[in-house]
Amino acid sequence: MTEREEFLDIFHRYVTRPGSEKLLDWLDTKTDFFTAPASTRFHGAYDGGLCAHSLNVYRVLRSSFFEPDTDTEETYAIVALLHDLCKANFYKKGTRNVKNDETGKWEKVSSYSVEDMFPYGHGEKSVFLIERFMKLKVEEAVAIRWHMGGFDDAVRGGSFAMSGAFEKYPLAVKLHISDLEATYLMETR
């Protein structure tokens, strides 16, 4: 099973709320989500890296934190698979020059650059894009909004809202931890 097929299988199996099929159709036909990288030069910086990263976050979140008595499969699938939706149609493929240490000559290599057509932030942009098609529960929206934790620009700018979000919504902490584990412990840089 390809990563795209696995993503679609999990999504179809667990995400059933109104609008989910329209969201998935948009994701599949109007974005590069399944072929986009997860970053420009670090984790998942390859074609399909975004989908692979989303699946890794899902695996960590599901295996480390899921409590069948209190959690729902749908919520876990939504927040993990869609937390980085903001990165769809976000990167542009190109080339850059790199000096070959052996020959001393400059060579063109494939690269990615950011081309943000809708500069709306990171987590908040993912929430906005999802809610164009389907409603999120408050805990889902908060978890996706703050999944970057201390790396979020608002936190670096001095906002204390993340602390309140983490105290009130444990799912936000769990998603952040899962994202960190997937990024720094599972994925090659």
Residue ranges and their predicted role:
Residues L23-K30, H43-L55:
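All-alpha helical catalytic cores of prenyl diphosphate-utilizing isoprenoid enzymes
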Residues S39-T40, G44, A52, R59, ...:
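Divalent metal-dependent catalytic cores for phosphoryl transfer on phosphate-bearing substrates
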Residues M1, T188-R189:
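C-terminal end-of-chain micro-motif
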Residues M1-A36:
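Non-catalytic interface/linker regions that flank or bridge core catalytic/transmembrane domains
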